[in-house]
């Protein structure tokens, strides 16, 4: 759990912004959204595999674009 200590003479808005940023870095909101509804194990595996395929395609396209620029 992210903890933010409010500094002396620090506006509340700034402290709240720091807290939100620390929550974002910790991945709390993403975790809550992922656990909001039950996801069947088969669906989770399918989603993870699709994400891996997408990452691989993105990596290959970046490598191909770099090769084209070298010539």
From Swiss-Prot:
GO terms for biological process: translation. Belongs to the bacterial ribosomal protein bS21 family. This is Small ribosomal subunit protein bS21. GO terms for cellular component: ribonucleoprotein complex; ribosome. PROSITE patterns: RIBOSOMAL_S21. It comes from Shewanella amazonensis (strain ATCC BAA-1098 / SB2B). PANTHER family: MITOCHONDRIAL 28S RIBOSOMAL PROTEIN S21 (PTHR21109), SMALL RIBOSOMAL SUBUNIT PROTEIN BS21 (PTHR21109:SF22). Pfam families: Ribosomal_S21 (PF01165). InterPro entries: Ribosomal_bS21 (IPR001911), Ribosomal_bS21_CS (IPR018278), Ribosomal_bS21_sf (IPR038380). GO terms for molecular function: structural constituent of ribosome. Keywords: Ribonucleoprotein, Ribosomal protein. The keyword Transmembrane does not apply.
């Amino acid at each position: 759990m992210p903890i933010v200590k409010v500094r002396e003479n620090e506006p509340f808005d700034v402290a709240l912004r720091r807290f939100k940023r620390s929550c974002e870095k910790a991945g709390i909101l993403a975790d809550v959204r992922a656990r909001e509804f039950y996801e069947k194990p088969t669906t989770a595996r399918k989603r993870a595999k699709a994400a891996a395929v997408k990452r691989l395609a993105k990596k290959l396209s970046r490598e191909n674009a770099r090769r084209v620029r070298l010539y």
